[in-house]
């Protein structure tokens, strides 16, 4: 759209163009967008000025997210630009029911800036919808990923500490490529025959760990929703097996199901 004669262009057309910029921002140069904002802000119409202000706010937010994303990529790249780095994280350590799940993800850390995956962060800080969207993108862009689980019966037999380490180990060992380095969240993975560095609050610092956190959570949440179809009295579709008041009361009323961790229910039954 040619904005040289902006005063002759209808508001609705300008708004459509503004919305297109936001949707297809990667196809525009930053300077080009800044020039458009300047023209919109000089228009005598208040509603057009508001479009310029909204576009400027969008640009600032995008710049902040770009910086945050680059920091997460650079955190992993500091270990070596030519390294294959896997991030690994688990979800489901604390629930009363269901498996513990881990994912390992190897990303291309040297992709061009605009090809990087934006909005990646600790899965707990994302909405369910955003996690689902990012799960698809991560799987598509990953060099390799693998999801592993340890079921409730094994958790009861071997204990949660063993199961937690085992599921992380299985996730890494199931990758189709062998990484040079494994980054884990919070603590080291024992008995792993690959160099391993653990990162405190890794899912907020490392793009690889945060990515693994997201696909592990999406996988487990969807699994618990499937279980809920035959065990709807426990509310697995929204509590994911965690010990909410509703869940605890259901256990007391109906007893445990086949996917409950009996070793976690000693204070309930």
Swiss-Prot record:
Q: Which GO terms describe its molecular function?
A: manganese ion binding; RNA binding; RNA-DNA hybrid ribonuclease activity
The cofactor binding remark recorded in the entry reads: Manganese or magnesium. Binds 1 divalent metal ion per monomer in the absence of substrate. May bind a second metal ion after substrate binding.
Q: Which GO terms describe its cellular component?
A: cytoplasm; ribonuclease H2 complex
The cofactor named in the record is: Mn(2+); Mg(2+)
CDD domains, alphabetized? RNase_HII_bacteria_HII_like (cd07182)
Q: Which UniProt keywords apply?
A: Cytoplasm, Endonuclease, Hydrolase, Manganese, Metal-binding, Nuclease
Check the record and name the SUPFAM superfamilies matching this protein: Ribonuclease H-like (SSF53098)
Positions bound to a divalent metal cation? 89-90, 185
* EC id: 3.1.26.4
Which part of the chain is the RNase H type-2 domain?
83-269
Question: So which residues are the signal peptide here?
Answer: none
What is catalyzed by this enzyme?
Endonucleolytic cleavage to 5'-phosphomonoester
Asked if the record carries the keyword Manganese, the reply is yes
Tell me, in a sentence or two, what this protein's role is.
Endonuclease that specifically degrades the RNA of RNA-DNA hybrids.
Question: Which named protein is this?
Answer: Ribonuclease HII
The organism named in the record is Clostridium botulinum (strain Langeland / NCTC 10281 / Type F)
Q: What is the lineage of its organism?
A: Bacteria, Bacillati, Bacillota, Clostridia, Eubacteriales
